[in-house]
Amino acid sequence: RYWLLADGSRLRLNARSKARPLLDGAQRRLELRRGAMRLEVKEDPRGAFALDCAAGRVDCASGSLLLAEERGAIRLVTLRGSARLTTGEGRQLAVAARRSLLFDAGGLLEQGPMQAGEDAWASGWLEVHDRSLAWVAEAFRPYLPGILQLDAEIAGNRVSGLFPLDDMHTSLDMLGRSLPIRVLRYSDYWISLRPA
């Protein structure tokens, strides 16, 4: 679901995500409190739209970008248009269009070209290309009402695929059929992934 903001920009939040708007006549600003957001920034004479997060700030004059928590850091993906990243330590970095960066308050952790499917959740899908099962399980958790346990023995298994986020039962079954794992459902609120 999208929200149309007062300046004409459009915001989409991922499951269990939270953002706080700080919009007034003088500034355009959002704070990512938890999860992931996609923002389509409309150009405005007041200047760039500021996105605050635990690890720094992103400014974008116009375009589309994704900001998401990932492994204790923040993922920034510039889908369309460029942005400026200011890390928690004050370092500034110009980010070109179609780039993907991972950063924390201490600075840049990784950067590279945008990967296919990084924003697929906005369309209801998780697109995975050679990621660990631990990464996939973490991506599934916001869409499950309870606990998803993952046995450490299988956490490193590599996964590729396209998974429907609005049908976790099917997504988990797909993992069980494609990997040497067992999906144990004790209830809708307690699911465990174990070695086969």
Each language-model region and where it sits:
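Short, small/hydrophobic-biased targeting/export segments
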Residues: 1-105
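N-terminal export/assembly leaders
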Residues: 107-196
